[in-house]
Design a protein with these regions (language model features):
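Conserved N-terminal phosphate-binding loop of PLP-dependent enzymes in the Aspartate aminotransferase
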Residues: 1-173
């Protein structure tokens, strides 16, 4: 009945809290790139440690890809970039094609563990669903990952020139 926060990229803090709450831990949720707090990337060693540690239990591994999904990392999803496979992926923003829509995608073994049909109060907003349909259809029609790669190369080339300015402290990504 509680949410335990761990210091981002701190293996020791994660391990201590995991040991303290391991009998009551249902899931580990991670936002792989914390955009709001300044584009902080999860460390691959930290992510690997989490995945390896919780795979020994029934703890679910959840990726919050609301911000990172659909090509924003140069991959369809950030978990592909980090080479891990979560049990559940949370999606939003882009998938609605500009309209509010959230999606919880999960492995079949989890989906099949819910008896009967599931629903929510605002399920099935037809306008958001149609917008999502056209957004996903458009992604199939264009080679969007190739376009993203070209933009990435362009910005990486030109950011070298920007680093010379004193007001530029850091580049991430």
């Amino acid at each position: 009945n509680q949410f335990i926060k761990c210091e981002f990229n701190n293996i020791s803090d994660f391990t201590n809290k995991l040991n303290k709450y391991k009998n009551d831990l249902a899931a580990v949720i991670i936002e792989p790139i914390q955009a709001t707090s300044g584009f902080n990337f999860v460390d691959k060693k930290f992510l690997s440690h989490i995945k390896q540690t919780i795979s020994k239990s029934n703890t679910l591994f959840i990726f919050d890809e609301v911000w990172t999904g659909f090509g924003k990392t140069g991959h369809n999803f950030a978990y592909e970039y980090f080479k891990v496979t979560p049990d559940i992926v949370i999606l939003g923003k882009s998938i609605g094609g500009g309209l509010p829509l959230g999606v919880v995608a999960m492995k079949n073994k989890i989906k099949n563990s819910f008896p009967g049909a599931q629903s929510s109060t605002f399920q099935g907003n037809i306008l958001s669903i149609q917008s999502s349909y056209f957004f996903l259809k458009e992604l199939r029609n264009i080679n969007y990952l190739k376009k993203i790669k070209k933009l990435e190369d362009f910005f990486n080339f030109h950011r070298r020139n920007l680093i010379e300015y004193k007001f530029v402290n850091d580049f991430r990504g």
